[in-house]
Amino acid sequence: MKNVKKKNLDNQVEKLIELPNSLEAEQSILGGLMLDNEQWDYISEKISENDFFSLSHQLIFREMKYLLNKGYPIDLITLSESLEQKGKLEYIGRFAYLAELSKNVPSTANITTYADIVRERSMVRKIIKIANKIIQAGYDPRGKTSQELLNLAESKILSISEQNFQKNSGPKNIEELLDITLANIEKLFNTPYKGITGINTGYQDLNNKTSGLQPSDLIIIAARPSMGKTTFAMNICENIAMTYKKPVLIFSLEMSGEQIMMRMLSSLSRVNQEKLRTGQLNDEDWARISSTINILLKKKNMYIDDSSTLTPSEMRSRSRKIYRENNGLSLIMVDYLQLIKVPSLIGNRTLEIAEISRMLKSLAKELKIPIIALSQLNRSLEQRRDKRPINSDLRESGSLEQDADLIMFIYRDELYHEHTDLKGIAEIIIGKQRNGPIGTIKLTFNGHWSRFDNYSESKYSDE
């Protein structure tokens, strides 16, 4: 009984509190559009009919869109005639209200500012509406766990954020783009050229091919099992974390954080992994490990999320959170792409991978940082004589090939040919580079250190 009373009271309070709106701004937009039809293209980029608080204003805006799509002008006569033919004129206050709208416009020059006001109020109303749904789901979870409720809340809030991001994007004038491009060129001109315009990978030959990892790029690293794709990606992350101030964020869906740290200590300390795993360390090993730990604790610029199950929305929200808290990121790495799940698309792996790929590319563009995503390869390449991977070997390759700016494959001949002359050598095959050449570079693979190094015949060690 108490719950019923509380619910009724909540409903009464909700009715007393008017949702945020600006009827004056809505009226000024509609009146301004009747006076200046050319403003439609600017306004329709910012708001839609659902952004209006007044149902009458939604109806008028929808009718304006209909008339303009038909090639008709919108004014008092055409608008009232069209509404009357559909029997809707009386719902909006008839001709008199339309006349009042066009008469009371402060200025058509400020119409885009009015649209910003209407959109802002609309966004707040959407947040309130979603908050109420989350509260309702909390009172009546219908079997949902607390984690499922959190995922629901997160996805709904993120959907609003995405809508807002899309409204802020759109065509840019060539003058604006030229200004941005020229500023970038001047920045590069005034910076001593070292063959790198993006993020330094730590690998000289790879930098020469790619000019570094570029902002907003989606980078796919793919290989068959045991080739070292996690090691290679982690080495890039380590190199960047040691060089740049802004942190690196790692999503490790396959390995635990402790396993990642064990590999990192082996790699950076040059201490054999087997020694670390068994604890059979000598004084020199301990000295190296201690030195590495001190450096890592001093830098403190790497985050590892080892959640074994993540959705695109969870990954996106966690990335944004770390980005905001640190005023930026240098890089995001995902190990590996096929382990991410899209609940609404489970059962259709092709569509699921396409959605994951789209999200990662969108996030890279939004945060303006490179994102590395590891991917599996199809088993079918094992049937070929030459087992060096190509783009079509990517699992669910269509969307990955399309969205990726850079695709790199790892091939180590020693895994297929025991007596090869290429022992300890890894080929990094660039299968796609949107703004650069494709080709192959060599790196030295020191597996016992969990490390790829710049290629040199003298650098390989099997100790």
From Swiss-Prot:
Keyword flag Ion transport: no
Give the GO terms filed under biological process for this record. Answer: DNA replication, synthesis of primer
Q: Which InterPro entries match?
A: DNA_heli_DnaB-like_N_sf (IPR036185), DNA_helicase_DnaB (IPR007692), DNA_helicase_DnaB-like_C (IPR007694), DNA_helicase_DnaB-like_N (IPR007693), DNA_helicase_N/primase_C (IPR016136), P-loop_NTPase (IPR027417)
> Which Pfam families does the entry mention?
DnaB, DnaB_C
Query: What's the family?
Result: Belongs to the helicase family. DnaB subfamily.
Q: What is the catalytic activity of this protein?
A: Couples ATP hydrolysis with the unwinding of duplex DNA at the replication fork by translocating in the 5'-3' direction. This creates two antiparallel DNA single strands (ssDNA). The leading ssDNA polymer is the template for DNA polymerase III holoenzyme which synthesizes a continuous strand; ATP + H2O = ADP + phosphate + H(+)
Q: What GO molecular function annotation could you give as one example from this UniProt entry?
A: DNA helicase activity
Q: Name one GO cellular component term.
A: primosome complex
Q: What does this protein do?
A: The main replicative DNA helicase, it participates in initiation and elongation during chromosome replication. Travels ahead of the DNA replisome, separating dsDNA into templates for DNA synthesis. A processive ATP-dependent 5'-3' DNA helicase it has DNA-dependent ATPase activity.
PROSITE patterns (UniProt xref):
SF4_HELICASE
**SUPFAM superfamilies attached here?**
N-terminal domain of DnaB helicase, P-loop containing nucleoside triphosphate hydrolases
Membrane-traversing stretches: none
Positions binding ATP in this chain are: A223, R224, P225, S226, M227, G228, K229, T230
EC number(s) on file: 5.6.2.3
Identification of the protein by name: Replicative DNA helicase DnaB
**According to the lineage, what is the superkingdom?**
Bacteria
Specify the SF4 helicase domain's residue ranges: 192-459
Quaternary structure and interacting proteins, as annotated: Homohexamer.
User: What are the alphabetically sorted keywords of the record?
Assistant: ATP-binding, DNA replication, DNA-binding, Helicase, Hydrolase, Isomerase, Nucleotide-binding, Primosome
